[in-house]
Amino acid sequence: MAELSEEALLSVLPTIRVPKAGDRVHKDECAFSFDTPESEGGLYICMNTFLGFGKQYVERHFNKTGPRVYLHLRRTRRPKEEDPTTGTGDPPRKKPTRLAIGVEGGFDLSEEKFELDEDVKIVILPDYLEIARDGLGGLPDIVRDRVTSAVEALLSADSASRKQEVQAWDGEVRQVSKHAFSLKQLDNPARIPPCGWECSKCDMRENLWLNLTDGSILCGRRYFDGSGGNNHAVEHYRETGYPLAVKLGTITPDGADVYSYDEDDMVLDPSLAEHLSHFGIDMLKMQKTDKTMTELEIDMNQRIGEWELIQESGVPLKPLFGPGYTGIRNLGNSCYLNSVVLVLFSIPDFQRKYVDKLEKIFQNAPTDPTQDFSTQVAKLGHGLLSGEYSKPVPESGDGERVPEQKEVQDGIAPRMFKALIGKGHPEFSTNRQQDAQEFFLHLINMVERNCRSSENPNEVFRFLVEEKIKCLATEKVKYTQRVDYIMQLPVPMDAALNKEELLEYEEKKRQAEEEKMALPELVRAQVPFSSCLEAYGAPEQVDDFWSTALQAKSVAVKTTRFASFPDYLVIQIKKFTFGLDWVPKKLDVSIEMPEELDISQLRGTGLQPGEEELPDIAPPLVTPDEPKGSLGFYGNEDEDSFCSPHFSSPTSPMLDESVIIQLVEMGFPMDACRKAVYYTGNSGAEAAMNWVMSHMDDPDFANPLILPGSSGPGSTSAAADPPPEDCVTTIVSMGFSRDQALKALRATNNSLERAVDWIFSHIDDLDAEAAMDISEGRSAADSISESVPVGPKVRDGPGKYQLFAFISHMGTSTMCGHYVCHIKKEGRWVIYNDQKVCASEKPPKDLGYIYFYQRVAS
């Protein structure tokens, strides 16, 4: 490289910017690859746009955008010097005292076992003229000051990825409870002693909670590992509705742990001293005798590395490196994302769409490629498949690796992808653990949005479901079809092969808990796969079915079949369910999944000879056998004007209020719960719950229910104002018809952003309507643009499959635990556990959560 002259630097001085508070500085990762400052070529940060690029891509940015001056960062690792007081190479590590990241007393993510030597240069393209950071002294003051301030600001600025990951996350920041100033306490309570407490329903003497309404002392929740309490405090809340409780043993003059069951979170109670004095407790005289919830959670986070389930940790595994064997770093509860994308990029259709067309995608990328979906997915696919990042962890300065690092690779850290895919989503934008199945569907939805008029790899998963409903009173039937991407397989626990052992285990467990003894060895339910398949295809009774043949309620049976078989069949084992108390729980079950699978018997047949269809008549808004004005709807009983405040029709449907209340108590929005009950035809809590789970990601999930033919709430002004032509043009340019654009805008009060979300969440209905318009004689030009397919495109073929991948989950809930995946490559099973990629010796195929089957060529 040539030395940078004063004249060259003066020529680019006007383009050098100093980053401000709102600027995103991408100095950790290349926008097009996973190169970092630690990569061989270092990282070039544009001093105008603050985007980072590896050596391979920096000229692409220069040629496309024009800025010539870049800050070149190159870092090399060296081991930390040995601390003489510890006798090891590691300095004394501070024990975290707060459940926080990036704040005093919290977890320090910057702590490493090595130090970094940093080389900083200013480089001007295209000739790569350079000058070292400390070589600016001989330049004129105006030049030196401008460049130095920009360099120092870039180096000191928080990187975009750091802001995304950390955001000074503090798990101890609590909100004031909404009950704090209005809590009603019962009169004449018992006086609570300052010590010697015991649960009033069992003999537990720790993890005790004092209810601030009635003074009851009860034990806390049971933790995932069997420790903790017996759930008596939360059960008391469900029985009484008394919302606030304080953890005994944590009360000090400075405060205490207060939990709100109603708000489902740790909270602040500014009136705590007053509330405690009601029971004779003087906060000023209390001392801490038990661990706070923060301390317990920190201990749990520090022990999480000890988990060995499903990871084949008891067996020596051979590490694998090279193309297709790239690990992914865990960015903090991101293992759900890692597992899903690893499987997707093992499928040829996703490879062809994004990796094979990498250059074309990058060439068409916008000025800021970090915000482009196709660019970031292509970058992710290339990072996984190229082998460039599938290398052992670099050796330390003495040429050795610690033993536990021998099977670990650097892998890739998909920070930009995670930030983009989760942008605007209430869950996936956080660092909390998520459900891999929900993320799979979210990613499928994002791919769908970005492949509207081009090759769509989602077609490998898409299939049609045929649902047949038969009215038992008239024997008449109704067939419907819908698009799906996942086969959700129920787990009939009553079909377990080891029922006696399970009953014996439960009895031993109960006795051990009563006697405070060690729990017996776990006995897991063994359910045959054939029983799960039978349960999926079994007829399901539908009570209170509105029969259009009878024009009255009847009983019906519903059967579910496949109208088409996809190239890749995704099966979710429904391990996560709800107990009788509506508390989420995970079924601890073993299902021996077959390597070869034939579901040909589940193919739908459509309307059969001799079957008579139910009349296609819409049910009445208020069925004759239901009282008007009930279930929370408003109106004068002497008039026929009964309507919900959310509905515009004066004769709104009667919904099962008990089911709505159950769903609302679980934390779902009221309007979403009303829609769930409405769209499942008042067919019960389970059906409504399934609807909620299937539609949680819909953009209009929490919007009020708008009945067919009604304008919906707040639509008066929109109806009066025609949709703006520029909004219509924008939607049409995305490949939709003018009719579809107008319909979407009218349904969303002419909001362009909401209209786009609405049109994607109703795409199947719109395509079906367009197809119907064509069949009724309208021209294709009048009904739908040529670029929009008529109906969902599905592939079909034989129903014979072979297992090629599965995702496993460890933990008691989708909101915690860990995910790993196993993928069959080159005839052998491979386990992907974050940065560890190894040949699998005993793949736990019976303990998976999501299974991926590939069609067998006939």
Swiss-Prot record:
The keyword Cytoplasm applies. Gene3D superfamilies: Cysteine proteinases, DNA helicase RuvA subunit, C-terminal domain, Zinc/RING finger domain, C3HC4 (zinc finger). InterPro entries: Papain-like_cys_pep_sf, Peptidase_C19_UCH, Ub_carboxyl-term_hydrolase, UBA, UBA-like_sf, Ubiquitinyl_hydrolase, UBP13_Znf-UBP_var, UBP5_UBA1. Keywords: Acetylation, Cytoplasm, Disulfide bond, Hydrolase, Isopeptide bond, Metal-binding, Nucleus, Phosphoprotein, Protease, Repeat, Thiol protease, Ubl conjugation, Ubl conjugation pathway, Zinc, Zinc-finger. It holds the Pfam family UCH. The modification Phosphothreonine is found at T292, T623. The modification N-acetylalanine is found at A2. Ubiquitinated by SMURF1; leading to proteasomal degradation. Residues 654-695, 722-762 form the UBA domain. It catalyses: Thiol-dependent hydrolysis of ester, thioester, amide, peptide and isopeptide bonds formed by the C-terminal Gly of ubiquitin (a 76-residue protein attached to proteins as an intracellular targeting signal). GO terms for molecular function: cysteine-type deubiquitinase activity; zinc ion binding. The modification Phosphoserine is found at S149, S156, S779, S783, S785. The active site is at C335, H818. PANTHER family: UBIQUITIN CARBOXYL-TERMINAL HYDROLASE. Deubiquitinating enzyme that participates in a wide range of cellular processes by specifically cleaving isopeptide bonds between ubiquitin and substrate proteins or ubiquitin itself. Affects thereby important cellular signaling pathways such as NF-kappa-B, Wnt/beta-catenin, and cytokine production by regulating ubiquitin-dependent protein degradation. Participates in the activation of the Wnt signaling pathway by promoting FOXM1 deubiquitination and stabilization that induces the recruitment of beta-catenin to Wnt target gene promoter. This is Ubiquitin carboxyl-terminal hydrolase 5. It comes from Pongo abelii (Sumatran orangutan).
